[in-house]
Every structure is written in C-alpha cells, then in structure tokens.
C-alpha cells in the first residue's frame, strides 16, 4: 500500500462543510493554535477505517510521506496506522519511529488519540525512559508539553499517579489554555481512580491552579464539593 493510495482514499471522503466546521473548531485563523493546519473534512471514523484496512500492508517509507503531510487528516491517519502497528506487537520500533516524528504530532486530537496508546503504554513498561516526559514538560513547544501530561494517562489506568502529579505541577504556570485543559483532564482521571489523591493535590496547589484546570478536574465531584473548590472554601 502506497502513501499516494492512502491519500487518495482519504480525499474521496473529503467534505467541504465538514472542512469548514473543522477549521473553526480547531481554530485555524491567523495567530490561532492551528494556523499551520489544513483540513479536507474527513470524519474520524472514516480515517480509522482506512488506517485499519492498511496498517498491515504499509511500511515506514510510505508512512514517512503521510506523517509530514500538511493535511491534518493525512497525518492523523498515519498516527492511527502507527497505533495499530504498535498494538500488533511492533512496539519498540513504532515507539522509536514516533519519537523521530514527534514534531508531526502537532494538534490536540493527534496527541490525545495516539500518545497514551503509544508513548504512554511504552513508558509504563520502560520506566527508565520516563525522563522524556520531564523534557517535554519543559519544552517551548505547546504540543510537546501536552504530550508530556497526556502520556501519563497510561499510568493512571495502571493506578500509578506520581508522574501525572509531577508533570501536572510543572505545568501549572503554563500560559496555554490547551495545557490547562489537559492537566485538568488528567487530574479528573486521577479523581476517578483515587478521590483522596486528587483532592489533596488540588488543595496543596490551589493558589497556582488555573481556573480552567480546576473546572476540568472537579467535573466529577458532587455539587457541594465542586462549589467548595470553586469558592476555595474546602
């Protein structure tokens, strides 16, 4: 399977109205976080289907052409292909390839869909490499910082919370709303596993918590607790 064939198949599902919706939803205007991105309007289920159909027949030389493509849906398909290959037990090779192409993981949906399944899962089983998360958390690149916190989702699923809290704390002073949301999301996932650990973190770091992070983190709390945290009266 060639990259050209995959791209042609994706383009066959292109939809102008969906393209316009995605351009607004992903904020592609001048100065916005997706200014670099181009959309053709392919729905995620269609992208997943194409990736599933071809991940066994496509090699890295063809994925090379997909993963650097300026079209968002093409890069997304490349990353889903990698995720499928990783889950088919090609783990170390896919992990290293993903690292080599991490600059192409440059929008929040690309991060959120594939990072826990590849980066996070690999690090759970190779803890000596978790230093990468701290490197990314201190990066000037928005997407690397989001990768750092979202990768810890794989650890949360294993009831391991230390990395989430450590990376989350590093990112509390971040200026980007997309980081505030990601940290809050991961804290909410911690809350679903261990209420006390999450609440202790919120109390200890309350003065530094961006409001968006707090709102995301407390979504699952009973109303009385949510109000207390919003008012700082816990």
Which residues fall in each region the model found?
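Alpha-helical scaffold domains
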Residues: 1-234
């Amino acid at each position: 399977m060639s990259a050209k064939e995959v791209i042609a198949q994706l383009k066959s599902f292109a939809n102008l109205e969906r393209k316009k919706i995605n351009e607004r939803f992903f904020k592609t205007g001048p100065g916005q976080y997706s200014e670099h991105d181009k959309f053709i309007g392919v729905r995620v289920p269609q992208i997943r289907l194409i990736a599933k159909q071809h991940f066994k027949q496509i090699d890295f030389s063809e994925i090379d052409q997909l993963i650097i493509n300026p079209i968002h849906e093409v890069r997304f398909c490349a990353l889903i292909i990698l995720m499928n290959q990783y889950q088919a037990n090609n783990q170390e090779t896919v992990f290293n390839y993903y690292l080599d192409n991490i600059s192409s993981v440059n929008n929040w949906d690309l991060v959120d869909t594939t990072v826990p399944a590849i980066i996070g899962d690999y690090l759970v089983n190779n803890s000596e490499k978790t230093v990468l998360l701290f490197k990314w958390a201190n990066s000037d690149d928005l997407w690397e910082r989001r990768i750092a916190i979202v990768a810890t989702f794989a650890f949360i699923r294993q009831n391991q919370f230390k990395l989430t809290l450590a990376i989350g704390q590093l990112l509390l002073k971040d200026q980007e709303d997309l980081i505030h949301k990601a940290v809050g999301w991961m804290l909410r996932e911690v809350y679903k596993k261990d209420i006390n650990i999450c609440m202790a973190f919120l109390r200890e770091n309350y003065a530094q918590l961006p409001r968006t992070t707090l709102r995301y983190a407390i979504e699952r709390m009973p109303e009385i607790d949510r109000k207390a945290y919003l008012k700082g009266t816990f």
